[in-house]
A protein has these predicted regions:
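Positively charged, amphipathic and often flexible ligand-engagement surfaces
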Residues: 1-308
């Protein structure tokens, strides 16, 4: 079945109470560990060290989104500052961080979110670390890009993700500040057909086209996909145009297509893995299941294996 068409049924399944109890219970935890480094920063750093041994860099993501009170956003800022402090004392690891703006208070106000992001960016600037902004559902795109553009006026080391499943993303690319750092992703949220493409072919074609456009216009591009055809297409485009590899990076998710991660790293390409950690891992995990049928099959088959 087509990936975008399958996403809805899978996400509805993960909303069922019995499914959540299964995943978060004793049987599910060993499988969750494949996709989430753990609930603590130490777990994420341990995963980063293992990846470093494979010539793979790391982007840390302290899981959480749509906080329900401003003080929870402040707590999230504290978690990121602690992560950045940890990066300071791990100088041999190539670590960056990624944040969701709804975790930093975007649902409450633009001003609160910007103030919280300023604290994170100031801590990151002290150690020269890049901070990436995750893109959330289509309802947040305008607000997310507004925050990004405002912060970009004062900070160089901040970037944002764009989703090729959304019909609007080509226009958003046209309005980016010069020399932006962009993570290009397919997108994992369930979206209505009026705002998102309905077929995998459309999403993949847009991914390839926008990756080429971003690179041709001088942006730094983090190509975030596990699709070998799109990865190979990027390599061909970069080499044909003689684009320096300092402007390109391949990014993948922790626990997914580790064979591909290792192959690219061993071939000398820059690879960075998105390492999530924290207690709020369930929404993240369910999106991973929905975006790739293979992930759902892996989870189900391993539940059976661990349950024996």
């Amino acid at each position: 079945m087509n990936g975008p068409l399958l996403r809805g049924p899978v996400l509805r399944l993960t909303e069922a109470g019995w499914f959540r109890r299964l995943v978060t219970g004793r049987l599910g935890r060993p499988v969750v560990a494949r996709f989430v480094a753990g609930e603590h920063l130490d777990d994420a750093v341990r995963a980063a060290k293992a990846l470093d041994g494979q010539k793979i860099s790391t982007i840390l993501d302290h899981l959480g989104e749509n906080v329900t009170a401003p003080e929870h956003a402040v707590e999230a800022v504290g978690a990121y500052v602690r992560a950045l402090d940890r990066i300071r004392v791990e100088p041999f690891l190539d670590l960056t961080v990624s944040v969701k703006l709804t975790q930093l208070g975007l649902d409450f106000s633009h001003e609160l979110c910007v103030a919280n992001m300023e604290r994170v960016l100031e801590a990151a600037a002290e150690i020269g670390t890049l901070v990436m902004i995750d893109m959330e559902s289509s309802a947040y795109v305008d607000r997310t890009l507004r925050v990004f553009r405002e912060l970009r006026e004062r900070h160089d080391r901040v970037g944002v993700a764009l989703q090729t499943c959304l019909r609007r993303t080509g226009r958003d690319v046209d309005e980016l500040p010069d020399g932006s750092v962009i993570r290009i992703v397919k997108g994992a949220y369930l979206e209505p057909p009026e705002v998102a493409f309905a077929t995998r072919r459309e999403v993949d074609t847009t991914f390839a086209q926008l990756t080429a456009t971003l690179l041709a216009r001088g942006h730094v591009v983090h190509v975030a996909t596990h699709d070998p055809a799109l990865l190979d297409g990027t390599v061909s485009f970069v080499e044909r145009r003689a684009i320096p590899w300092t402007r390109v990076e391949f990014q993948m998710l922790y626990g997914i297509r580790r064979d591909l991660q290792n192959r690219l790293a061993n071939e000398g390409y820059p690879v960075r893995v998105y390492v999530p950690y924290g207690t709020e891992w369930y929404p993240y995990l369910t999106r991973r299941m929905a975006e790739r049928p293979a992930n759902m099959w892996f989870f189900a088959s391993n539940l059976v294996r661990f349950g024996r």
